[in-house]
Each structure stands twice: as structure tokens, then as C-alpha cells.
Curated annotation (Swiss-Prot), chain B:
This is ATP synthase subunit c. Coiled coil: none annotated. It is found in: Cell inner membrane. One of its GO terms (molecular function) is proton-transporting ATP synthase activity, rotational mechanism. Belongs to the ATPase C chain family. Pfam families: ATP-synt_C. The lineage of its organism: Bacteria, Pseudomonadati, Pseudomonadota, Alphaproteobacteria, Rhodobacterales. It comes from Jannaschia sp. (strain CCS1). The keyword Transmembrane applies. The record marks E61 as: Reversibly protonated during proton transport. The keyword Membrane applies. The chain crosses the membrane at residues 11-31, 53-73. F-type ATPases have 2 components, F(1) - the catalytic core - and F(0) - the membrane proton channel. F(1) has five subunits: alpha(3), beta(3), gamma(1), delta(1), epsilon(1). F(0) has four main subunits: a(1), b(1), b'(1) and c(10-14). The alpha and beta chains form an alternating ring which encloses part of the gamma chain. F(1) is attached to F(0) by a central stalk formed by the gamma and epsilon chains, while a peripheral stalk is formed by the delta, b and b' chains.
Amino acid sequence: MATETTGGTEAAGMPQLEFSTFPNQIFWLVIALLAIYFILSRIAMPRIAAVLAERQGTITNDLAAAEELKLKAVEAEEAYEKALADARAEAHQIVAEAKAEIQAELDVEIQKADAEIAAKTAESEKAIAAIRESAAESVKEVAKDTAKELVAVLGGKADARTVTAAVNARMKG
Amino acid sequence: MEGDIAQMGQFIGAGLAAIGSGAAAIGVGHVAGNFLAGALRNPSAAAGQTATLFIGIAFAEALGIFAFLVALLLMFAV
Amino acid sequence: MADEAKGGIEIHPMDQFIVEPLFGDGAIHWYTPTNVTLWLFFAVVAVTLLMVVGTRGRAIVPSRSQSVGEMAYGFVYKMVEDVTGKEGLKYFPYIFTLFLYILLANFLGLIPGSFTTTSHIAVTAVLAGAVFVTVTVLGFVKNGAGFLSLFWVSSAPLVLRPILAIIELISYFVRPVSHSIRLAGNVMAGHAVLKVFAGFAASLGVFSFIPIFGIVAIYALEVLVSAIQAYVFTILTCVYLKDALHPHH
């Protein structure tokens, strides 16, 4: 390399290859690196490591606390759900009871009404039967009388008893 | 500028050596492009490989820097 | 040299990386306080502000600055745990130191007019070399000669194994190189491009708004790259550590 001969402060060639400055650069570089190394390893790195560890610890603790709170929240939710279900069941029960009561009342009323209806029906039936009876009697009377008259008109002497028996036989037959 | 053949040779040589920088650029582009192609196919694996990417780029680039250095030496140091 | 630029455009994209003494302009000895020293000091201050002052509240519910510090802690912690497993957590302070230093040095370097310590190969080589030595020593201490099984791919056919062993060995020793150049190269390239665009803006007069838009876009990209490079450096450290703890394929 030709630079070894040039040297000096003249801007000839690459300053990087100015070998006369190498010992100087190396000397100061080593000092600077040692300084940085000691600053880092004695002060900065233990401090940062401690801070990071502390933060890690805090985060872990916070996470645990959060987990606990979450569990609590889940428990509370469960209790709430249970209460809700209970209330719902109770409401159902009340509804069912009310329904049963109403049903029972309704049944009683219906029965009463049925009985009344049945009594009325029986009464009417009796009345109808009486009417029918009397109607049948009247028909018998009319038939007897008619039969007597007919016999008389035809010239016979009607025996009341025979006529009645004949009419009765006819009415039955 | 009168007929200094040696100086002309220096300059021509420096210019030729500078071509090497372009070649290194091709190399670096190749590395990065292939990395991107692979990363798009499998994005989940890409994050773990960026260190490899940079090492590859560094190796490709170092040789280009050597060419640049030769150019500098020819220009300034010979 | 490109510095003898033509056509009126004077761009010195590499000037921002020059190491110079803070006081006077004598020779740079190994103990001379330089702009590297200043910005490394700022990185230490930034780490202190973020991780010590920001977390002083020790609150369970973190303040804004405390949660940023905790996020960074948790991010790297998870990364180490995912990649290396439980055994790797012993080395978490070491990896966290690397991550925070790279991330904050990258971001500090994005302040206009600042000096970016991570753009220097000397710096990143120390970081990557330290990782390499640590991982190799750790591998042999933990596994003894069994660590060499890392290179003996037992799943490959027997004929191929010696060839694979050579390839694995080479790739093992290339690790610190790519590990360091990747970080320095990314940061350096971004800053140099910003400077080139700034040079355009200075020379275009009325039309300078076009490169200024470009600067805004590239600046945004650089913010992203700063974070990604810190992440990549850290995760590769984790991967190498995993190889040392569990060398069997």
C-alpha cells in the first residue's frame, strides 16, 4: 500500500489506511469499550435485570389477583343464576296452585250446575209423564164412550164392562 | 490530463470494481425476494426466520462491500 | 490521485475520515487525544445516558427513556438466548457492549460534521478480531480438540470431507475479515456517498435541490443501515459464539 509513505495531515489516499494512526485508534477504542463494558455490567444491567424481574413479579401477582377476582365474579354469577332459577320455580308453583284452585272451584260449580240441570230434567220428565198419562186416560174415556155410542147406534145394548175390557185390550195391543 | 496511462488504468479498474456492488445488490434482492415468497406461503414460520434473513443479506452484502473496497483502494490508495 | 479533480467540482469524500489531533497538529502518537478519542468519548456518554441515566427511575411502569433502554436490553438478550441457547447468556454483557457501542457510534456518526469511529477499519478490526480470538479460545477451552469437529463435516461423504475441511477452515479465517470490513465498508460507503452528493449540491447552484433530495433519501437509508449493521454484527457474533459452544454440526 502506498499510503504508508504519504502520512501526515495531507488528504491523500484513504484515511482508513493511514497506519500511523492505528495505535492511537486502537488504544482509545479499547479504553472506550472497557468503559462501556464496566458501565453496563456494573450499573446498567443489574439495574435493568432487577426492574424486569420486579415487573415480572408484579405482573404475575396482578394476574393471580385478576384470576381470583374472575373466580369471584363467576361465583356471584352462579348465585345470581340460582336465585333467578329459584324465583322462576316459585312463580311456576304459584301459577300452578292458582290454576288448581280455580280448577277446583270451577269443578264444584260445574257439578252444582249439573245437579241442578239433572233435577230440572227429572221434574220436567215427571210432568211430561203425567201429561202423557192423563192424555192416555182421556183417550180411553173417549174411546169407551165412542164405543158405547157406536154399539147403541148399531142396536146393541152395550155392556159397560165388556166395552171397557175391549177398549183396554185395544189400547194395549 | 495528459497521457497518464497508470491513472487511466486506476479509474477504469475502479469503475469495473464498482460493478461488483451492483452484483451484490442482485444477490441481496434475491435473498429478500425469496424470503418474502416463502414468508407469504407460510407466514407463521416467517417471524422466526428474520435473523436468518439478515445473516443471509449480510453475507451477500459483504462481498459487494469487498468490491467497493477494491474500487476505493484503486481510487485513493494505489 | 482523484483529488486533483477537474471541471470545477471539488469533492473530497474521504476527508471526513481523517484522524487529527484535538490540540495543535503534531504527530499522532498512540496516546494523543484525537477526534477519534472525542467521538469514542461521546459514544460512552451516549451509552451512559441511555442505559444509566435513562433507567435511573427504576420504575415498574417505565418512562420513555427507560423503556428504550429496556427494549435494547431485551432485544439483545433474546437474540443471544435464541441463537446460542442458555449457555450463551454468560457472554451477554460482552455482546451487549459491542451492540450498544456500534449502534450508538453509527448514529453519532450520522450527525453532520461528526466523526464516525466505526468507519475505520482499525476500529472494526479490533472489534471483529476480539470476537474471533474470544470465540476460538472459548471453543478450545470448552470442547478441547473436539472443537476441530467444526471443520470435519460428519454428514458429508467421507471422500468429500477433507476438501470440505479445507473450505471450512478458510471460511473460518475469513470470518473476522468480512466481519470487520462489512461494518466499516457500509458506514464508509454511506458517508462517502453523502459527501459526493453534497459536492454536487455545492456545484450545481440553482439546481442544487436535486442532490439535496438525494441526500435526504440516502440519509434515511443510512439511519436504517446503521441499525441493521449493528444488528448484523451482533447476531454474527452470536452465531460464531454458538459454533464455539456447540461445534458439532
